[in-house]
Curated annotation (Swiss-Prot):
It comes from Prochlorococcus marinus (strain MIT 9312). The gene is dapA. Pathway: Amino-acid biosynthesis; L-lysine biosynthesis via DAP pathway; (S)-tetrahydrodipicolinate from L-aspartate: step 3/4. Pyruvate binds at residues 56, 215. GO terms for cellular component: cytosol. Homotetramer; dimer of dimers. HAMAP family: DapA. SUPFAM superfamilies: Aldolase. This is 4-hydroxy-tetrahydrodipicolinate synthase. The record marks 55, 118 as: Part of a proton relay during catalysis. The active site is at residues 145, 173. Catalyzes the condensation of (S)-aspartate-beta-semialdehyde [(S)-ASA] and pyruvate to 4-hydroxy-tetrahydrodipicolinate (HTPA). InterPro entries: Aldolase_TIM, DapA, DapA-like, Schiff_base-form_aldolases_AS, Schiff_base-form_aldolases_CS. Pfam families: DHDPS.
Length: 300
């Protein structure tokens, strides 16, 4: 059954969702044991939910079988109150439909469905693509994922509004880098659509114009601080929220000094989590960048 998502104060997926890295062994295989340990650590340190197999999880280099096995391992280990959302997007509609069906059948709490990349469909094509996905698993809550910098295609608010006719489309990860995106979505779609910042550095500004939370990379490292920032903002302690926002800005910037998830994997390694190197064609963080990152981590 699709939950009531109309309460701005209580978004179904929660407020801090960690876009979790996919750990790899030295041989480059998925390290399921470490994924279990990391996901539980994240839940215990501020995360309301875990997003698997998204951009940060290196979904383009994971097979569908690996993605399924990763979900089964993580979901089976976590407390039931922690939402587990699986990336099921593809630029092939039939593949996205099948992946979303499988996520639902396997017990996922939700699916993250990215705007189709490379083939650059028009808005009508995007509407039909997401309609097919929504119809394929009508009881699975969906989060749309708009990240035009990676996909080359922008999902417009008017199209999102049309898609809200499907009761399982509850939210959107807004990762265009534009604060105005939240304002536009709220104006057209209202409060029934939960808007999540897709950028840690824009979380506080986006909260101020109606976002409900964040799909975060930095929460691997500072989940409790992000939680305090959101709670401070909600309770009217804006000065404290701003102080946390400003303190964490160097980290937010460092985690995107090169392509995500290269820096966060290096940061986790520096913090004692041997999550392995990114899969090719991504490459490890350079030594110079790693020194910069290490300095920032020690200053937190």
């Amino acid at each position: 059954m699709i939950p009531d998502n109309t309460k701005f104060t209580n978004p179904f997926f929660g407020r801090i969702l960690t876009a979790m890295v996919t750990p790899f062994t030295e041989n480059g295989n998925v390290d399921y044991e470490l994924a279990i340990k990391l996901s539980n650590y994240l839940f215990e340190n501020g995360s309301d939910g875990i997003v698997l197999c998204g951009t940060t999880g290196e979904s383009p280099t994971l097979s569908w079988a690996e993605q399924h096995d990763l979900f089964i391992a993580v979901k089976g280990s976590l407390d039931s109150s922690c939402k587990v959302i699986v990336g099921t997007g593809s630029n092939c509609t039939s593949e996205a439909v099948e992946a979303t069906k499988k996520a639902y059948d396997s017990g996922a709490d939700g699916a993250l469905v990215v705007v189709p990349y490379y083939n650059k469909p028009p808005q009508e094509g995007l509407y039909k693509h997401f309609s097919s996905i929504a119809n394929s698993a009508k009881d699975l809550p969906l989060m749309l994922y708009n990240i035009p910098g990676r996909t080359g295609c922008n999902l417009l608010p008017d199209t999102v509004k049309k898609l809200m006719d499907f009761s399982n489309i509850l939210s959107i990860k807004a990762a265009s880098g534009r604060i105005e995106e939240v304002t536009e979505l709220r104006a057209i779609c209202g409060s029934e659509l939960s808007v999540y910042s897709g950028d840690d550095s824009l979380l506080l500004p986006m909260l101020s114009v109606g976002a409900v939370g964040v799909v975060s990379v930095a929460s691997h490292l500072v989940g409790l601080q992000l939680k305090e920032m959101i709670q401070s903002f909600q309770s009217g302690k804006v000065a404290n929220a701003l102080a946390i926002h400003e303190k964490l800005q160097p980290l937010f910037k460092a985690l995107f000094m090169t392509t995500n998830p290269i820096p966060i994997k290096a940061a986790l390694e520096l913090s004692g989590w041997n999550v392995g190197k990114p899969r090719s064609p991504l490459s490890p963080l350079s030594n110079d960048m790693k020194k910069q990152l290490s300095f920032i981590l020690t200053s937190l």
